[in-house]
Amino acid sequence: MKKGYIKLIAAVILGVAIIGGGIYGVYTLLSSNTTTILYRSTVDDKINAIRPYIVALDSYNAYSVAYANQLQPTLEELRNGSHNTTITLPKYKDLKTALEAAKQDSPTPYEDVNQSTNDVLAVLDQLIPVADQLQAYYVERRFEKDNFKGSDELAAQYVPLAEQFYATYNALDLALDNRNNELYTERMTEYQGEKRENAVNFIELNLMTAQTIDLIDPDGNTDTQKVEANLQQITQRINKLQPGTTSETQNAVREYQDSVKEFVAEARNYIIINSSYGEAYTQLFIKYNKMVGKANVVNMVELDATDQKKK
């Protein structure tokens, strides 16, 4: 995971699916009972189990990418002992609240996700009080009285904890990303068996765009030929994507297609022209994250006209 630019996770969105004879919404949990949740077995159950964790990280990541040009300099200044009159810190408290709620309401069947969540929360318990003190120090402009002595003392506590947080957070992000991709693959296998070719194409598009953003390295080690080959395949697939069976899904697909095309153009410009421009990598991630947001609105269940719908 590239430090400072943690991509949003393309969540598996079901919209409303028919499960076991009943209507089951994407945010609905089978049960709050831990034993029941841990022994879920269907793809839908597992999707709903990890969904709150993905939502928690999506929110944190969106802020982190949007304010990377302030968050990264703040950390570097605190690490190096250089001083500024303002600081920008990540939204640690919001992440902690969201992860605690996810852990309470939706235990997952994945030990790596559960353990990584516990690790992140353990670090946040130590990090948040120091971050609060640091924020208050700068808001109250105490540096005007002590010539940044208090800042240096708090930074000595904050920086090691922040580094520890990034390590544990990246582990959780990676675990969720891997599990999410597994669920995409499981869902795709089901759809292949049901001859849902449009939904399969949609899933493969999301997997390919995720692979592409991971291939692009801001340090100059990008395999540009591989990226370009992916972009060409993405373009072919997005042009083949059909609009779906309902007006709502058709609108969502059109917006998704437009967003994918924007991402392809941005990625191509980056590897050809803009890779030496520092802000270009952030802008590429913003385009990617926008595309993920559009993908999450598409109801895969309504992408193909099934035999049941045709009757």
Locations of the language-model features?
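Immediate post-signal-peptide N-terminus of mature secreted/exported proteins
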Residues: 29-84, 152-159, 174, 186-207, ...
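Hydrophobic alpha-helical membrane-insertion segments, chiefly the h-region
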Residues: 12, 16-27
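Extended amphipathic alpha-helical interaction segments
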Residues: 151-257
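Secondary-structure edge/capping motif, primarily at the C-terminal ends of alpha-helices
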Residues: 64-78, 102-109, 131-145, 179, ...
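N-terminal Sec/ER secretory leader and immediately downstream segment
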Residues: 44-150
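N-terminal Sec-pathway targeting helices
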Residues: 2-15
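A cross-kingdom marker for long, charged
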Residues: 229-311
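Polar/charged, Q/E/K-enriched amphipathic alpha-helical segments with strong coiled-coil propensity
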Residues: 132-163, 271-285, 289
